[in-house]
Amino acid sequence: EKTVRLQPGVNNLSLPLSIDSPHLWMPNGWGEAALYAFEVSVCVDGKLVAKKQHQIGLRTVRVVHEKDSLGMSFYFEVNGIPMFAKGANYIPQDALLPSVTTERYQTLFRDIKEANMNVVRIWGGGTYEDDRFYDLADENGILVWQDFMFACTPYPSDPTFLKRVEEEACYNI
């Protein structure tokens, strides 16, 4: 537990975290998708005003795109190990996004896991998914290849538009 004092306005914090004998998150088929729970609470004058709980998996993921004997490689490396990607493209489950229940997400990820997939790509013509999607992906050892929502049309390249794209990318990452 750590207490920090915030100033009015935007506060950017970086707090050290220590985990005894940490286990790495592994993709489906490689071992356990180890997750660690953490919680952030905001109190004002001793009164709880906000609380956020989340799970994280400790891992490194890298896209390897290097010159090789055939031209250029392109593969994922997870925790320093090359990964053979087995997955599918994902489009929104329903045109009415709020109608996608937790149970439907759970069924989707059960099916993905049972099909021995380890990655799912969210198509750029779809939508940024609900947090439940990403949480279930983590819990089931599924990497998410997240397209940005820029598909099927040319886009402007003026500074104002590019600034908005940058903001969208930062928000969604």
How would you describe each model-predicted region?
Residues 1-120, 139:
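Secreted/periplasmic carbohydrate-active enzymes, especially glycoside hydrolases
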Residues 161-173:
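An active-site-proximal structural segment forming one wall of the substrate-binding cleft
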Residues 109-112, 118-163:
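Aromatic-lined substrate-binding rim segments of carbohydrate-active enzymes
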Residues 100-104, 129, 164:
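Short secondary-structure boundary/capping elements
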Residues 25, 88-90, 97, 123-125, ...:
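Long, contiguous hydrophobic alpha-helical segments, chiefly transmembrane helices and signal peptides
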